[in-house]
A protein has these predicted regions:
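ATP-dependent carboxylate-amine ligase catalytic core
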Residues: 29, 34-37, 63-156, 172, ...
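A glycine-rich beta-strand to alpha-helix segment
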Residues: 397-427
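C-terminal helical cap/extension that packs against the catalytic core
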Residues: 201-216, 304-305, 348-409
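Acidic, Mg2+-coordinating active-site environments of NTP-dependent enzymes
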Residues: 110, 135-142, 158-250, 264, ...
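Beta-strand->loop->alpha-helix junctions that form or flank phosphate-binding loops
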Residues: 198-199, 213-233, 253-258, 285-291, ...
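Short functional linear segments
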Residues: 1-46, 53-66, 71, 107-115
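Short, high-confidence coil segments that cap the C-terminus of an alpha-helix
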Residues: 134-137, 329, 385, 406-407
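Nucleotide phosphate-binding/pyrophosphate-handling subdomain across enzymes
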Residues: 38, 138-143, 149-162, 166-170, ...
């Protein structure tokens, strides 16, 4: 089997198996030699921002000269993106080698009457092998869905657990209230392991604090009052960070979104708490933050063109806060799509009310969760936007939106799938 065949096979896995309890994943890890053991792991859960927090942590560890692994999801263009070693995607050879070992163990387990690991479980198992064989010292690991029952939660003794902002997403799996969702995310907390969490919402924060107390885990709430913005421009944000009793740090990030201050601060606070483990000076940590590379998070993909992966109500609210800042001085064009299981009516209403875009192009992501471009366009019209058109094909939609942009700004938003498709399209377009 070659790399392409392996990827094709992995993509078929959801058609013939289901998610399994953690014991199933633990058994397969054991059969693979428990590759996760001996790696210093930071475990990150949350609804929004967990990928960014992972990227900030990875950037700071790299700045400090550490050999790192980064496990995140979803991928935007190529599946290899889910596994990074020292900031670079793993090679096709590393990917295939890990897949063959995992698939061999899975087939043997199946022969004993057990189920094949799910899509995400397969990738998690592959990741643990990839990082062990690469000899990484630190692994920054993002949960797939939720926390308590996530495959990543089989890791028994991480260095720290981080929980980012909580919002209503995947409610059919995680519960309908913020507190219920927070309870699922807090399931990653391990006895005695420090937990650092976004404390900006009292309900979820109280659930996380209670779980930490139950587990005997030191709890470090990250309050919005710990950071203060100094400047915001197209180049990024500068801000100060100081926890009570701590000295003030001057930080800079190459992102325009205000919400990234919380994500960067969560990561910086975690590295402060783990100072005795990594021994990286604070000025080096700050330098690492400033050099982060994490695609499609308010990313300037071309002059005046920003791609953002916001794909639920809270994410869109944060997006609107940032885009609204630029709308004061620029004519705004929106390229938008969403999938059917998101609250896209509310997302569209938020965009129209908060930004009042001059132009809107609606497009669609084909597949089982498709929302036709014309349906989205009609929602924009009902929400009060006037210059709205529908273009189902993403490349053509981008060109149409770019044509409407003029000297203003174009924001592409609504779905991580859209972000990935646009990244692939722009790579081809720009040669």
């Amino acid at each position: 089997m070659n790399y392409t065949e392996a990827v094709d096979y992995i993509e078929t896995i959801p058609k013939f198996t289901v998610k399994h309890p953690p014991e199933h994943t633990r058994e397969l890890l054991s059969r693979l030699g428990n590759p996760q053991e001996g790696i210093k792991i930071i475990h990150v859960a949350g609804t929004n921002g967990k990928g960014s927090v992972c990227a900030y942590l990875n950037a700071m560890l790299l700045a400090g000269g550490k050999k790192t692994g980064l496990f995140t999801s979803p991928h935007l263009v190529r599946i290899n993106e889910r596994f990074q070693i020292n900031g670079e995607d793993v090679s096709d050879e590393q990917f295939l080698n890990a897949f063959l070992k995992v698939e061999k163990a899975a087939k043997e387990y199946e022969a004993e009457g057990e189920g094949h690991p799910s899509y995400f479980e397969t990738l998690f198992l592959m990741g643990m092998l990839i990082f062990k064989e690469a000899g990484v010292e630190y692994l920054v690991m993002e949960t797939g869905l939720g926390g308590r029952l996530d495959a990543t939660n089989v890791v028994e003794k991480p260095l720290a657990c981080i929980i980012t902002s909580i919002s209503r997403d995947h409610t059919e799996y995680l519960g309908g209230t913020l507190e219920a969702i927070a309870g699922e995310k807090a399931g990653i907390i391990k006895a005695g392991v420090p937990v650092i969490y976004d404390a900006s919402q009292p309900g979820p924060a109280s659930v996380i604090a209670a779980k930490a107390k139950e587990m005997g885990s030191p709890a470090w709430p990250m309050e919005p009052s710990f950071y203060e913005m100094k400047t915001q421009s197209r180049e990024g944000i500068t801000f100060t960070f100081a926890y009570p009793g701590g000295e003030k740090a001057e930080l800079a990030i190459p992102y325009v979104a205000k919400y990234q201050m919380m994500n960067a601060s969560l990561a910086f606070y975690t590295m402060h708490i783990l100072q005795d483990v990594h021994d990286i000076p604070k000025n080096v940590l700050a330098e690492g933050l400033s050099k982060i590379k994490w695609p499609c998070r308010m990313e300037m993909a071309a002059p005046g063109v920003i791609i953002d992966g916001a794909h639920n109500e809270d994410g869109i609210a944060q997006f609107v806060s940032t885009a609204g800042y630029f709308a004061k001085e620029n004519e705004i064009t929106i390229l938008f799509t969403a999938v059917a299981d998101k609250h896209y009516h509310e997302m569209i209403g938020e965009i129209c009310e908060g930004i009042h875009p001059s132009h809107v192009v609606a497009t669609q992501i084909d597949g089982s969760r498709v929302v036709p471009a014309e349906v989205l366009a009609e929602d924009f019209r009902k929400a009060g936007c006037t210059d709205v058109c529908a273009e189902p094909e993403i490349g053509a939609a981008y060109e149409k939106a770019l044509g409407k942009k003029g000297s203003g700004m174009l924001f592409c938003v609504g779905s991580l799938y859209l972000a990935g498709e646009l990244k692939a399209y722009l790579a081809k377009r720009n040669g």
